[in-house]
Regions:
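Short, compositionally biased P/S/T/A/G/V-rich stretches that sit at domain boundaries
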Residues: 74-99, 111
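Surface-exposed, short loops/turns at beta-strand junctions within beta-sandwich domains
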Residues: 154-162
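Short acidic/polar inter-strand loop motif in beta-rich domains
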Residues: 170-179
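Aromatic sugar-binding surface patches on proteins
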Residues: 144-152
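Active-site-adjacent structural elements in enzyme catalytic domains
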Residues: 189-339
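Structural beta-strand segments of beta-rich domains
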Residues: 102-106
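Bacterial signal peptide processing site
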Residues: 31-33
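Low-complexity, Gly/Ser/Thr/Pro-rich intrinsically disordered linker/tail segments
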Residues: 420-497
């Protein structure tokens, strides 16, 4: 895993130093009015620059990258590229332990819409602000998404040794490195660690703005498709097993995504399953609460927070029975010593049972919920955010197209259905229902509350409101229903057509 290079995104910022419904709500259904469903297989995402390290000339990689830009719906945004780049890029390599002769994927992610090229070349000196000294074997100028913006390239088979990832400004912007990162390609495969006995997975690092950016970019690429497409998949597992879409495919080096684990979330499960999968792969904290749906005129409420380190806390002050797959005293050598099988069973049972749509409708000022309400802006309506409607449906923001002189901006979101299908939809009132009713709770656009480590107890907990910069308990609600829709449209299309 690469280091956090300190993106200053306003998306999520933890200020804690040292923390490295009534009857309608009760209906709570994932079935929802939507646009006609297209091809269930989903069109292929935008292709990436690809080369075999030390076998393909740089020119072929550039050609492949240039073709990619026309295929991706979330390609270069409409606004002219900026040459200023105040944020350092975050670099990422998949798998976590690259092995000679095997494919790897390289990325750079930043908040800046800068015109730049990502290159992967042999390195003879440590990464620095100075340029690389060898010709790249793969490079791409294809800037995707925004914000955050990502450059992505595939290497079919890298040779063992030291390599350098570098993001460089275009000649039109004066050239010069925006940042670099050294990558080691090994001659040997890393041993697969044993599944932990007591925790779901070990926490190896904490969430940061750069990792939140990476999460957003991952979601955007996972569900990418041409703008006029309406892709649908039979299950989320079909998406995650698509190597081109999922850059975390077999990230742990254990062929974990080839085990055929069933992953079939409904709408309320989908954001939790995506967040848990990303956290499981990267060793990040993950948490979830046990929430009510709201009843007798009272909105939903959440309590009894659980995490990857403490997945079975008491609920309603009563101890939970620990299932056999999570029993720390289980006999060794059984199927639950396989980390991916345990993770899949956690999704299918514990998390699916706990996750429900009431979690997305807790009151805006409530600090006990898994989500917090966003201040609406072009920076916050990014992949990974969720939309919870007042009546029990939940969608995950999957991408956004910027406004052009001739067309309005577009917001894409994906949702799950009770039969496990996942489809992509555009923002419009028929898909994104909104109401303001205290008995139903607070609907609208929200984001996962960051899970942090309490400096006093060393336990994982959810961050309070005061530590989240892009939170607003009033922004989506103060203008009423019409004001909400007007504000979203203003974010998507800030200029008159």
């Amino acid at each position: 895993m690469t280091k956090d290079l300190g993106s200053s995104s306003v998306f999520v910022r933890i200020a804690w130093a040292g923390l490295a419904a009534g009857g309608l709500a009760a209906l709570a259904s994932c079935s929802h009015a939507h646009e006609p469903v297209g091809d269930r297989s989903g069109p292929p995402p935008g292709t990436t620059a690809r080369a075999t390290a030390e076998s393909a000339p740089p020119s072929s990689a550039v050609s492949s990258a240039s073709r990619a830009s026309s295929a991706s719906s979330l390609g270069p945004p409409a606004p002219a590229p900026r040459c200023d780049a105040p944020h350092e890029p975050f670099f990422f390599v998949s798998p976590a332990h690259p092995v000679a002769g095997r494919p790897l994927r390289v990325l750079a992610v930043t908040d800046d819409a800068v015109d730049a090229t990502l290159s992967f070349a042999r390195a003879s000196t440590p990464a620095s602000a100075a340029g690389g000294d060898q010709e790249p074997v793969v490079q791409t100028r294809d800037r995707r998404g925004g914000p955050p913006y990502a450059w992505l390239a595939d290497v079919d088979a890298a040779a063992a040794g030291k390599w350098r990832l570098q993001l460089t400004k275009s000649d039109a912007c004066g050239g010069g490195s925006l940042g670099a990162h050294d990558v080691t390609v090994y001659t040997w495969a890393a041993p697969v660690p044993d599944a932990p006995r007591a925790v779901l997975w070990r926490t190896r690092q904490l969430w940061s703005p750069a990792l939140e950016n990476l999460y957003s970019a991952w979601i955007g690429h996972l569900f990418d498709a041409p703008a006029d497409a309406q892709p649908s998949w039979d299950t989320l597992a079909d998406v995650l097993r698509d190597r081109d879409r999922n850059w975390l495919f077999d990230y742990l080096g254990a062929k974990e995504d080839e085990e055929g684990v069933a992953i079939k979330p409904d709408c309320a499960d989908l954001p939790y399953f995506l967040r848990a999968y990303f956290a499981f792969k990267l060793g990040l904290p993950f948490g979830f609460s046990h929430c009510s749906r709201g009843e007798n005129g009272a909105p939903p409420h959440c309590a009894d927070f659980a995490s990857n380190e403490d997945p079975f806390p008491p609920v309603d002050d009563k101890p939970q029975a620990v299932p056999s797959w999570a029993d720390p005293d289980r006999p060794p050598g059984g199927p639950w010593d396989d980390s991916m099988k345990r993770f899949g069973e956690f999704l299918r049972t514990t998390l699916a049972d706990a996750a429900q749509s009431g979690a997305g409708r807790t009151p805006a000022a409530d600090e006990d919920g898994d989500y917090y309400p966003l201040r609406l802006s072009a920076d916050t309506l990014r992949p990974g955010a969720i939309f919870a409607d007042p009546y029990g449906h939940v969608l995950v923001v999957a991408g956004r197209l910027a406004q052009t002189p001739s067309s309005a901006g577009v917001l894409f979101a994906v949702d799950g259905q009770p039969d496990g299908t996942v489809g992509r939809k555009r923002f419009w009132r028929g898909n994104f229902l909104f109401a303001i009713d205290p008995a139903l709770g607070s609907a609208g656009f929200k984001r996962f509350r960051p899970v942090v480590r309490d400096p006093k107890t060393a336990k994982l907990r959810e961050a309070p409101n005061a530590l989240i910069r892009d939170l607003s308990v009033t922004d989506q609600y103060e203008g009423g229903v019409e004001g909400f829709y007007d504000k979203v449209e203003d974010v998507l299309s800030p200029s008159p057509l």
